[in-house]
Amino acid sequence: MSIEEIPQGADVNVIPKNEKKARELIKKLNLKQIKGISRVTFKQRGNLIYAIDSPDVYRSAAGTYVVFGEAKVDDMNQRIAEAQAQQAQQEALQKAAADAGKTEDKSPEAITADLEKASLGDKKAEDEEEDEGEIDETGLDPKDIEIVVEQTQVSRAKAVKALRNHDGDMVNAIMDLS
């Protein structure tokens, strides 16, 4: 039978010439074939695995095994990386679906709460504007004020206020503003 005579998609096992010779020699050694084994794996250092699906396994009287089949290299590090990437992608999809599922609440209570939050934000802005007026820096070292402003990225007035609240202690003033 030639290759042209085999129908497309047929399940045919083609045994190489060397493997055929090895099988004939195995039969002469009186090895017993073991049935029911669906997969054989050989593990090597570095999480490298050689896997043989649907192998032909023979056992000698001494307890050694001879395995025939097509070996496929299976890199566990690559598998783990792929699994982690797939898991991260699934989590991102779930998060996106959860975010898309959230709809804004347009009940009167929610609108009132939003307005109150906005008005509190306006009060904070007014406080900041009041701080920008005349600043009384008496009793404070100008270098301390500059250090607090640099470290916390706040206005000079807020830095002076924090230093006054902490009796000129720069560390506590910076921690308070951070």
Curated annotation (Swiss-Prot):
It holds the Pfam family UBA_HYPK. One of its GO terms (biological process) is protein targeting to membrane. Residues 82-145 are annotated as: Disordered. InterPro entries: EGD2/NACA0like, NAC-like_UBA, NAC_A/B_dom_sf, Nas_poly-pep-assoc_cplx_dom. Residues 101-126 have a biased composition (Basic and acidic residues). Component of the nascent polypeptide-associated complex (NAC), a dynamic component of the ribosomal exit tunnel, protecting the emerging polypeptides from interaction with other cytoplasmic proteins to ensure appropriate nascent protein targeting. The NAC complex also promotes mitochondrial protein import by enhancing productive ribosome interactions with the outer mitochondrial membrane and blocks the inappropriate interaction of ribosomes translating non-secretory nascent polypeptides with translocation sites in the membrane of the endoplasmic reticulum. This is Nascent polypeptide-associated complex subunit alpha. The gene is EGD2.
